[in-house]
Curated annotation (Swiss-Prot):
One of its GO terms (biological process) is translation. One of its GO terms (molecular function) is structural constituent of ribosome. Zn(2+) binds at residues 24, 27, 40, 43. This is Small ribosomal subunit protein uS14. Part of the 30S ribosomal subunit. Contacts proteins S3 and S10. It comes from Dictyoglomus thermophilum (strain ATCC 35947 / DSM 3960 / H-6-12). Binds 1 zinc ion per subunit. The keyword Metal-binding applies. PROSITE patterns: RIBOSOMAL_S14. Keywords: Metal-binding, Ribonucleoprotein, Ribosomal protein, RNA-binding, rRNA-binding, Zinc. The lineage of its organism: Bacteria, Pseudomonadati, Dictyoglomota, Dictyoglomia, Dictyoglomales. GO terms for cellular component: cytoplasm; small ribosomal subunit. Belongs to the universal ribosomal protein uS14 family. Zinc-binding uS14 subfamily. Binds 16S rRNA, required for the assembly of 30S particles and may also be responsible for determining the conformation of the 16S rRNA at the A site. Its cofactor is Zn(2+).
Length: 61
């Protein structure tokens, strides 16, 4: 979970649009970000395995 100070920092409006960057909505991780879901790969996997992401299934072939 992201620190309170980090969350407050992200919510403040940015002076310049270029300064915005992608972070996971759950844990705040900047790497392994999946744009379509707004999550990092770890949180995405966790939620997908629980069945909490609609339309996402584990691949098998």
């Amino acid at each position: 979970m992201a620190k309170k100070s980090q969350i407050v920092k992200w919510l403040k409006p940015k002076k310049y649009k270029v300064r915005e960057y992608n972070r996971c909505r759950i844990c705040g991780r900047p790497r392994g970000y999946i744009r379509k879901f707004g999550l990092c790969r770890l949180c995405f996997r966790e939620l997908a395995l629980k069945g909490e992401l609609p339309g996402v299934r584990k691949a098998s072939w």
